[in-house]
Regions:
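Rossmann-like dinucleotide-binding domain for NAD(H)/NADP(H)
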Residues: 5-7, 11-100
Length: 100
């Protein structure tokens, strides 16, 4: 069971969140606050987005992961994935989304 008026944080995929339902939950007081690094649309119209401008909503510009360590890990993981894929070691490829 969720706590009363939980804080919802989405650091994953914007497509996972029904923004209209989220706005309704915030308006109804079912959620205390919302934080996100990504919205449903990768290039949202912030002027018309109903989440923007609320005191209980924080949205970062899809950049929360940027750090020296994160970039180094991303570069290393990308290279390892290419090597594993070319060797036919699909089971070792991290987060293989679409098989070829």
């Amino acid at each position: 069971l969720m706590a009363r008026r939980p804080i919802f944080i989405n650091l994953g995929r914007g497509l996972c969140v029904d923004e209209e339902a989220l706005v309704d939950a915030l308006d109804a007081g079912k959620l205390r606050a919302f934080g996100a690094d990504v919205l449903y649309d990768e290039t949202p119209d912030l002027a018309s987005n109903k989440l923007v401008g609320r005191d209980n909503v924080i949205i970062t510009p899809h950049s929360a992961f940027y750090s020296t360590t994160a970039i180094e890990d991303l570069e290393r993981l990308s290279c390892e994935n290419i090597v594993h894929f070319l060797k036919g070691e699909k089971e070792k490829v991290f987060k293989l989304v679409n098989e070829v």
